[in-house]
C-alpha cells in the first residue's frame, strides 16, 4: 500500500541536504504489508471509479493521500448536508453549514507540518524523461521498483485516448510528443511491442506511424531521442554551449532568458556539445525499427530538423528563427566542432556550462527548478562522472517529484505546497471560525514561517544570472529555493492576517524583519510597465520570443509580467501599508499606482483578463478584480470593474454557475465548457470576482445563483467533485491543481456569508 510521508528525509545520508528540516517535503513510499482489507478495498474502489470515468473526467480526485489522511485523523463529517431547492432562498444558516462542512473537510486533509499536499501535474511529458535518464544511467531498476512500474503503467493506460495516442497533457487530443514519450516509457519498463492493457503498445505505435513516424516529434522530443540513440544529433537544432561564454548583456546570452528556458537549455547545451548518446542496446535498435517509417541508416537527418506533427504545432517557427537555426547548423557548428576550435573553445564552453549546472543543483539542494530540467541535469552530472557525488545527490531527490493518485504514478512540476497552503489558509481565515479550526490555522501559520526563504542563492549569485531570493516564498518548499512573486504576496497576506489574531490560537506572529524582506523582494520585480514578473525581473526584448524553439508552447523565452502576480502584490501591499506604514512607504505607494494602471491596461476588449496560470479568463478576472478592489477601486469609480462585471454576468450559465474550457488558454478567446456546463472552481472564481466588484450591493441574484450551485454540488463528506483541469503554463500546457476544488469554493462560501446580506 502506498503512503504519503511528510517532512521526512535521511538526515544521516551524505547525499541529501535540507535547509529547514525537510518541512514541506512530501514523498511516497510503498509498504507491501500495510493496509487492512477494508483500506485496500477503498483504494481499489477509487482506482476502478477513475478507470470507468476516465474519458469523462481526466484529472484524478487525489484520493489516495486523502483516504490516508482522513483515516489517520478519524475524520467524520458531523454537520448535516444541506441543499437549496428551486425557488428557495439561501439562508445564513444554510450558507454557514455548507461553509463549515467544507472548512472541516479541508482542515482534515492538512499535513502534519502544516501544508496541504496535492497533485500538481497534468502534462504527459513530465514523467518519461525520468525513465529515459535512469535507463541510460543503469539505475532504472533500483529507483523504480515493481510497485512504481505498476503505477506508471496504470497512469499511461488510464490516460491513453481511444485512438491510441496521448496528448501534450491529460485533457488534450493525441499528439506525437505525448504518444512517443508514453510508448517509449512502456517499452523501457519492459513491455513488449504488442503488450499492454487493451493492446496499448500496438495502438500507440500505429498512431505514431499513421502520423508520419517519430521524425515528426517536436524539437524537445528530438533532443531526448538523440540522447537515447533513437535519433541523430544531426537531426536536431544546434544548441552550442559557447553561448554561455558570451557577455551576459549580449541579446542571445542565456542570462536574457526566462529562468525555466535558461535551465532547460543549460544541460541540453552540455549534452549537445558533447554529442552524448546513451548505450545502443538491443532494445534501442528494435525501437528504431518500430518508431521510424524508413530504415534508420537511410534517414536524411538534415531534412527532418524542422518537421513537426500537425497536432503538436501550436507555435510555428517564424522565418527568422529558421534562418538562425540553419546558420548555426550549416556554418557555425561545423567550425566549433573542428580543430582548433573544438579543442580550445568547445571544451572551455563545456566546462563553463557544467560549472553553472553544478551551481544551480547546489542552490536547489539538487531538486533543480523543475521536473523538465531535473532529469537533464541529473544526466549531465552522470555523463561528467558516473560515480560522482553530484549524480548521487540527484538520485536522492527523485522522490520529491513522484506523486501517486488513483489514476497511477505521475511526476509533479515540483510541488505546489506553499501556493496551495497560502490560498487555502486565506479561505479558512475568511470563514471567521477561528475557534473551530484553530489547530489547522496554527499549523499552517507555522509552515509558512518555516517555508520562507532565508538566504540568497549560494555564492556570487549575480554572476550566475540569478535574482536574489532572500525573503521570498517558493511555489513548493524552502529547499527548492526558487523565489516566486505571487507565492510571496499570498504568503505575506497570510502572515499579516495571522498577526492580527490571538497568538494563543495561531501562534507567534512572524518577525517583522522577515516581512520586510518579503516586501523588498516583491518591489524588486516590478517592471516599468507596472506589472510584476514571477521569478526574475522582466526586461529582455520581447523580440527574443521569435526564437522560441518549442512548437507546443508560447512566451517562454523571456520573463513577462502577469496580471495575477500584480494583483496579488497589490492586495498584500495594501494590507502591509496599514500594519507597517513606515517601511519603504513612498516606494510602495508608487508601486501601487503603477500596478493598478497596469491591470487596467491589460483588460481585454470583452472586459475580462487573460489568466496566465489558470483557466483562464474567469481566473484572471477574479484576481484582477481582487487587486483593483483592494486598491480602492469600485464599480462606480472604475470603468474596468464595470466592464468586468458585464463580462461575468454575460458568461453565467443557465444553471447559475460558470464553466470555462481549457481551450480558452491556447486560443486566447473565452470558450465556455461544452453545453455551457458549470464547474465548481469557475463558479467560485466568478462569485469571488462579483463580490470584489460590489455586485451584492446592486443585485445579488447572480451571486445567489452561483452559490446555490456550489452548495448543491458539495459532496456528503464536505468535499467538492473533481471536474475539469484548472491550471496552465505557457498558454498550451495544462496543470492539475487538485486542491482548487476545495480552496476556491470554500473561499467563495466564506466571502458570501460575510459580505452578502442573507435572511436568518
Swiss-Prot record:
Q: In what tissue types does this protein appear?
A: Mainly expressed in petioles and roots, and, to a lower extent, in leaves.
Pathway(s) this gene product operates in, as recorded in its UniProt entry: Secondary metabolite biosynthesis; terpenoid biosynthesis
Active site: which residues?
A: 486 (proton donor)
One GO MF annotation is: beta-amyrin synthase activity
A single GO CC term for this protein reads:
lipid droplet
First-tier enzyme category under EC: isomerase
Pfam families xrefs: SQHop_cyclase_C, SQHop_cyclase_N
Q: Which regions are annotated as PFTB repeats? A: 99-141, 149-190, 441-485, 515-560, 592-632, 641-689, 703-744
What reaction does this enzyme carry out catalytically?
A: (S)-2,3-epoxysqualene = tirucalla-7,24-dien-3beta-ol
Superkingdom per UniProt:
Eukaryota
- GO terms under biological process: triterpenoid biosynthetic process
InterPro entries associated with the record? SQ_cyclase_C, SQ_cyclase_N, Squalene_cyclase, Terpene_synthase_CS, Terpenoid_cyclase/PrenylTrfase
Keywords noted in UniProt: Isomerase, Repeat
Keyword Calcium (UniProt): no
- Annotated signal sequence range: none
Q: What is its EC number?
A: 5.4.99.56
The record's comment on protein family reads: Belongs to the terpene cyclase/mutase family.
Function as written in the Swiss-Prot or TrEMBL entry: Oxidosqualene cyclase involved in the biosynthesis of limonoids triterpene natural products such as azadirachtin, an antifeedant widely used as bioinsecticide, and possessing many medicinal applications including anti-tumoral, anti-malarial, anti-rheumatic, antibacterial, anti-inflammatory, anti-pyretic and diuretic effects. Converts 2,3-oxidosqualene (2,3-epoxysqualene) into tirucalladienol, generating rings and asymmetric centers in a single transformation.
Question: What PANTHER family does the record tag this protein with?
Answer: BETA-AMYRIN SYNTHASE-RELATED, TERPENE CYCLASE/MUTASE FAMILY MEMBER
Q: What is this protein called?
A: Tirucalladienol synthase OSC1
Species annotation: Melia azedarach (Chinaberry tree)
User: What's the encoding gene here?
Assistant: OSC1
Amino acid at each position: 500500500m502506498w503512503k504519503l510521508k511528510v517532512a521526512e528525509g535521511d538526515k544521516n545520508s551524505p547525499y541529501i541536504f535540507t535547509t529547514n528540516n525537510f518541512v514541506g517535503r512530501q514523498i511516497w513510499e510503498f509498504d507491501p504489508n500495510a493496509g487492512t482489507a477494508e483500506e485496500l478495498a477503498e483504494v481499489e474502489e477509487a482506482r476502478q471509479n477513475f478507470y470507468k470515468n476516465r474519458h469523462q473526467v481526466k484529472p484524478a480526485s487525489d484520493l489516495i493521500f486523502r483516504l490516508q489522511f482522513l483515516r489517520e485523523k478519524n475524520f467524520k463529517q458531523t454537520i448535516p448536508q444541506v441543499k437549496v431547492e428551486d425557488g428557495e432562498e439561501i439562508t445564513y444558516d444554510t450558507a454557514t453549514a455548507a461553509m463549515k462542512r467544507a472548512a472541516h473537510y479541508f482542515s482534515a486533509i492538512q499535513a502534519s507540518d502544516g501544508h496541504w499536499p496535492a497533485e500538481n501535474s497534468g502534462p504527459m511529458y513530465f514523467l518519461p524523461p525520468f525513465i529515459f535518464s535512469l535507463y541510460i544511467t543503469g539505475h532504472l531498476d533500483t529507483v523504480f521498483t515493481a510497485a512504481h512500474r505498476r503505477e506508471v503503467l496504470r497512469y499511461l493506460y488510464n490516460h491513453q485516448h481511444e485512438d491510441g495516442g496521448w496528448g501534450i497533457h491529460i485533457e488534450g487530443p493525441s499528439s506525437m510528443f505525448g504518444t512517443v514519450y508514453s510508448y517509449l516509457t512502456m517499452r523501457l519498463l519492459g513491455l513488449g511491442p504488442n503488450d499492454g492493457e487493451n493492446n496499448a503498445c500496438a495502438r500507440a505505435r500505429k498512431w505514431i506511424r499513421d502520423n508520419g513516424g517519430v521524425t515528426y516529434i517536436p524539437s524537445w522530443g528530438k533532443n531526448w531521442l538523440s540522447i537515447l540513440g533513437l535519433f541523430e544529433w544531426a537531426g536536431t537544432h544546434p544548441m552550442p554551449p559557447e553561448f554561455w561564454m558570451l557577455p551576459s548583456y549580449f541579446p542571445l546570452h542565456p542570462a536574457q532568458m526566462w529562468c525555466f528556458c535558461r535551465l532547460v537549455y543549460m544541460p541540453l547545451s552540455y549534452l549537445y556539445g558533447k554529442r552524448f548518446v546513451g548505450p545502443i542496446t538491443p532494445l534501442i535498435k528494435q525501437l528504431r525499427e518500430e518508431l521510424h517509417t524508413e530504415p534508420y541508416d537511410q534517414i536524411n537527418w538534415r531534412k527532418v530538423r524542422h518537421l513537426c506533427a500537425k497536432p503538436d504545432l501550436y507555435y510555428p517557427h517564424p522565418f527568422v528563427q529558421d534562418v538562425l537555426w540553419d546558420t548555426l547548423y550549416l556554418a557555425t557548428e561545423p567550425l566549433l566542432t573542428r580543430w582548433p576550435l573544438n579543442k580550445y573553445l568547445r571544451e572551455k564552453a563545456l566546462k563553463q556550462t557544467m560549472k553553472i549546472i553544478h551551481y544551480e543543483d547546489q542552490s536547489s539542494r539538487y531538486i533543480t527548478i523543475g521536473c523538465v530540467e531535473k532529469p537533464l541535469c541529473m544526466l549531465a552530472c552522470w555523463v561528467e562522472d558516473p560515480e560522482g557525488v553530484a549524480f548521487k545527490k540527484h538520485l536522492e531527490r527523485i522522490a520529491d517529484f513522484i506523486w501517486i493518485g488513483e489514476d497511477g504514478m505521475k511526476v509533479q512540476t515540483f510541488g505546489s505546497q506553499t501556493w496551495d497552503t497560502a490560498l487555502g489558509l486565506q479561505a479558512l481565515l475568511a470563514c471567521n471560525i477561528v475557534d473551530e479550526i484553530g489547530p489547522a490555522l496554527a499549523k499552517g501559520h507555522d509552515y509558512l514561517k518555516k517555508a520562507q526563504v532565508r538566504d540568497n542563492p549560494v555564492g556570487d549569485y549575480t554572476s550566475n544570472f540569478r535574482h536574489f531570493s532572500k525573503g521570498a516564498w517558493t511555489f513548493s518548499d524552502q529547499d527548492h529555493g526558487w523565489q516566486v512573486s505571487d507565492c510571496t504576496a499570498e504568503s505575506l497576506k497570510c502572515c499579516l492576517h495571522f498577526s492580527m489574531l490571538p497568538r494563543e490560537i495561531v501562534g507567534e506572529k512572524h518577525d517583522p524583519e522577515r516581512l520586510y524582506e518579503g516586501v523588498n523582494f516583491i518591489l524588486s520585480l516590478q517592471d516599468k510597465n507596472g506589472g510584476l514578473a514571477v521569478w526574475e525581473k522582466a526586461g529582455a526584448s520581447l523580440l527574443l520570443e521569435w526564437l522560441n524553439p518549442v512548437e507546443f508552447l508560447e512566451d517562454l523565452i523571456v520573463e513577462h509580467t502577469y496580471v495575477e502576480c500584480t494583483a496579488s502584490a497589490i492586495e498584500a501591499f495594501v494590507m502591509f501599508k496599514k500594519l507597517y506604514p513606515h517601511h519603504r512607504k513612498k516606494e510602495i505607494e508608487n508601486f501601487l499606482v503603477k500596478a493598478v494602471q497596469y491591470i487596467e491596461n491589460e483588460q481585454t476588449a470583452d472586459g475580462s483578463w487573460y489568466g496566465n496560470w489558470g483557466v483562464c479568463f474567469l481566473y484572471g478576472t477574479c484576481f484582477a478584480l481582487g487587486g483593483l478592489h483592494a486598491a480602492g477601486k469600485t464599480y462606480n469609480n472604475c470603468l474596468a470593474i464595470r466592464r468586468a462585471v458585464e463580462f461575468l454576468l454575460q458568461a453565467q450559465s443557465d444553471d447559475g454557475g460558470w464553466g470555462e474550457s481549457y481551450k480558452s488558454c491556447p486560443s486566447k478567446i473565452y470558450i465556455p465548457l461544452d453545453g455551457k456546463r458549470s464547474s465548481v472552481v469557475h463558479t467560485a472564481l466568478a462569485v469571488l470576482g462579483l463580490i470584489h466588484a460590489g455586485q451584492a450591493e446592486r443585485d445579488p441574484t447572480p451571486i445567489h445563483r452561483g452559490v446555490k450551485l456550489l452548495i448543491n454540488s458539495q459532496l456528503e463528506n464536505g468535499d467538492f467533485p473533481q471536474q475539469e483541469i484548472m491550471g496552465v503554463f505557457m498558454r498550451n500546457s495544462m496543470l492539475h491543481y487538485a486542491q482548487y476544488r476545495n480552496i476556491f469554493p470554500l473561499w467563495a462560501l466564506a466571502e458570501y456569508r460575510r459580505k452578502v446580506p442573507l435572511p436568518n
